């Protein structure tokens, strides 16, 4: 099928031959259920709207309210702009997803590729929470301000229903696992009108989790977003992978040790390094923990460095039952983010 996915190829054949994609036919050919309304609507789309050389899945989940019910398999969503701006990196990622039969789709109406940050956060019960998306790091730069996606519009055009919150919070700063959520303390400076206790209490109720706050780097020049997903990741509720403490600032080391003790966590060191220069001040190259985790698959960024093997081995040991794939994602990474940043994973 080349670069085309099953859905795209099937619907293209239907369009050319005036075939009605009935639910039974869709199931027989594509391999899973797709409503006749969805199939018929997609059949009317032009070849350009189906991206010609990219797969656009059309599996719509029933959303009577703001909860996805009855779905445990996860789907990876990406901004359409990822394929437009970084086709090679996007196709490398798609190739890995297709290899492991991971469903994926592209989000319409976005203004940048960092969909993790502006899309709703899904709780473990399945609810979508749409936080306010107005990060301070986009302010003061006209190009960046104009790249801020209108979250309400993105949800509308992609038929996503979410509960709204007035808390200013990026999705990349929320890590959820088994009743716990890790966020960086950048949440407090992003919401100056709320007290720390108010924020933690409200977030706990919205996310249905115990809230754990970790320190972000003080310097915005070194970490302009302050997102938790660039510092740590959950293995399970009592174990986290994190940037190697011995290579980090003392105040970060002290904070992590305090958090480890307070919440009875095991901390597994992962190597990291920085390659920022005058041309790429926001580069995320060197951050292995910003991997993509979906279903039974983990896609780890590698950078052509000796640290690659060590990082991959550590992550594989932490997730012995997961399949580990690696990817060169550098053309995206130099812009300030990696795999978790450019994907939105929901079930």
Task: Annotate the PLM regions.
Residues 17-19, 316:
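Generic N-terminal simple sequence motifs
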Residues 20-21, 194:
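Short coil/turn linker and secondary-structure boundary residues
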Residues 2-14, 21-37, 43-46:
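Amphipathic alpha-helical segments in structured regions that serve as interaction surfaces
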Residues 49-347:
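The feature marks the mature, well-folded catalytic cores of soluble enzymes
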């Amino acid at each position: 099928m080349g670069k085309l996915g099953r859905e795209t190829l099937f619907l293209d054949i239907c369009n050319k031959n005036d075939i009605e994609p009935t639910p039974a036919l869709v199931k027989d050919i594509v391999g899973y259920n797709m409503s006749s309304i969805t199939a018929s609507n997609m059949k009317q789309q032009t070849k350009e709207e189906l991206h010609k050389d990219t797969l656009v899945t059309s599996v719509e989940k029933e959303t009577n309210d703001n909860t996805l019910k009855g779905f445990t398999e996860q789907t990876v969503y990406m901004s359409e702009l990822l394929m437009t701006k970084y086709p090679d990196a996007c196709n490398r990622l798609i190739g890995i997803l297709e290899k492991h039969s991971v469903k994926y789709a592209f989000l319409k109406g976005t203004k940048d590729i960092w969909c993790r940050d502006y899309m709703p956060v899904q709780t473990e019960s399945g609810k979508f929470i749409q936080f306010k998306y107005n990060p301070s790091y986009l302010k003061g730069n006209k190009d960046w301000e104009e790249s801020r996606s209108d979250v309400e519009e993105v949800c509308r055009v992609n038929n996503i229903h979410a509960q709204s919150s007035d808390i200013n919070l990026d999705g990349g700063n929320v890590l959820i696992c088994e009743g716990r959520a890790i966020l960086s303390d950048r949440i407090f400076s992003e919401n100056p009108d709320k007290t720390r206790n108010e924020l933690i209490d409200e977030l706990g109720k919205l996310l249905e989790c115990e809230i754990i706050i970790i320190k972000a780097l003080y310097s915005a020049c070194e970490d302009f977003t302050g997102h938790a997903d660039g510092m740590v990741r959950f293995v399970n509720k009592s174990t986290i992978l994190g940037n190697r403490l011995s290579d980090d600032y003392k105040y970060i080391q002290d904070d992590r040790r305090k958090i480890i003790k307070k919440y009875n966590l095991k901390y597994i060191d992962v190597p990291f390094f920085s390659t920022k220069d005058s041309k790429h001040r926001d580069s995320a190259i060197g951050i292995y923990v910003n991997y993509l985790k979906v279903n039974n698959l983990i896609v780890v960024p590698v950078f052509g460095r000796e640290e690659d093997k060590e990082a991959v081995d550590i992550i594989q040991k932490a997730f012995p039952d997961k399949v580990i794939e690696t990817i060169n994602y550098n053309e995206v990474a130099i812009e300030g983010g990696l795999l978790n940043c450019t994907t939105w994973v929901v079930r």
